Each structure stands twice: as structure tokens, then as C-alpha cells.
């Protein structure tokens, strides 16, 4: 997942 992207931050």
C-alpha cells in the first residue's frame, strides 16, 4: 500500500 502507498503511504
UniProtKB/Swiss-Prot annotation:
UniProt keyword list: Amidation, Pyrrolidone carboxylic acid, Secreted
Positions of post-translational Pyrrolidone carboxylic acid modification: 1
Main location per the UniProt record: secreted
Residue positions, PTM Proline amide: 3
Localization terms from the record: Secreted
GO cellular-component term (any): extracellular region
Keyword Cell wall biogenesis/degradation: no
Secreted keyword on record: yes
The protein's role, per its UniProt record: Functions as a regulator of the biosynthesis of TSH in the anterior pituitary gland and as a neurotransmitter/ neuromodulator in the central and peripheral nervous systems.
Protein family: Belongs to the TRH family.
Full protein name: Thyrotropin-releasing hormone
Gene coding for it: TRH
Amino acid at each position: 500500500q502507498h503511504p
